[in-house]
Amino acid sequence: MKKVHERFLEYVKVDTKSDETTRVTPSTKGQLELGKMLAEELKEIGVDEVRISEEGYVYACLKSNCNKDIPKIGFISHMDTAPDMSGKNVNPKIVENYDGKDIELGNGYTLSPSFSPELPMYKGQTLITTDGTTLLGADDKAGIAEIVTAIEYLINHPEIKHGDIKIGFTPDEEIGEGADHFDVEGFGADFAYTLDGGRIGELEYENFNAASAKVEIIGKNVHPGSAKGKMINSILVAHEFVSMLPLDEVPEKTEGYEGFSFLLDIQGEVEKTSLSFIIRDFDKEGFKNRKERFNEIAKELNKKYGEGTVTVTLKDQYMNMKEMIEPRMHIVETAEKAMKQCGIEPIKNPIRGGTDGARLSFMGLPTPNLFTGGENFHGRYEYISINSMEKAVEVILNIIKIYAEK
């Protein structure tokens, strides 16, 4: 039987960086390559009903081995890695018996406790890091490795009774499209867990309400020598728009349950400037107010510069899954119990982001999020503890056992 980190090291060799510009699903060929590889592996270890959809989703089912009426539990992870940094030619480094000090990644980069204050908690453990030139891909190939390893363990230990275990690997989560083509009905689970969290112990069932905002500003260009009273510089109107938003409610100044508006991109010249924002808030009313503020600012500026100067287009992306999870809190409570059984203290924090599970919960599949063990996702300083990965496998198995014993 393969060890969880051995699987992980195989998966990260496949470049699965997603790309929101391609407008196809999956957005990159590497995700299809990994999906086919996973489907073959699942078949080889004895999993039933393995299939890949046209959109590249991998679905499988390990059939129940007992006659009891046991809930059908799903475990889901995503195959893509973030567009933020290259996932090509990932060259992981193994750091055995970590000494709590700086780790030289190579290529002039150092992973240090001054940058990652949590590092000393991994002293004595075995870590997997990057070589400084790419991200690692623990988000979310660690989750995939943990699920497959847990499933193989069940197959090799038929004395462990379980109901139907549903497996799902999705493309394009990192560009917000992971649930777009997910076949909830065909998946057939009563509820599920994503393995897409970070530090050991993380258990999440709250996430941001999320929207995007596109702001387009139309100016008027006139020769600067005779522009007085005529020119409208769309770049300066854009600056005015941004200054009318709460200046302290931005990602770099917020934490916990605090929401924000985040200016992602600005493209402009005198006659036209475009702004791209994301809007985030945990509270439904606060989320509504943030979106309304964008329209109010547009209204004020149109009154000042002329109707049609500023146009705002808002699009909801995903909602806080808390309202869909709370009526079935046994899903969260069982995960807590499963962690405590293997000596892990659950860390229940809100997700300052989203997961496939957030959207799946509103599609009828309640899906909280479990840790994978990774740290510093999406960049060259990403790393993961093998010990944490092994504990994630234990948690999956404990969840399955708890439901089988009820």
Swiss-Prot record:
Cysteine-cysteine disulfides: none
Active site: 80, 173
Listed GO biological process terms: peptide catabolic process; proteolysis
Catalytically driven reaction(s): Release of the N-terminal residue from a tripeptide
InterPro entries: ArgE/DapE_CS, Bact_exopeptidase_dim_dom, Peptidase_M20, Peptidase_M20_dimer, Peptidase_M20B
Top-level taxonomic group: Bacteria
UniProt keyword annotation of Zinc present: yes
EC code(s) of this entry: 3.4.11.4
Described function: Cleaves the N-terminal amino acid of tripeptides.
Name under which the protein is recorded: Peptidase T
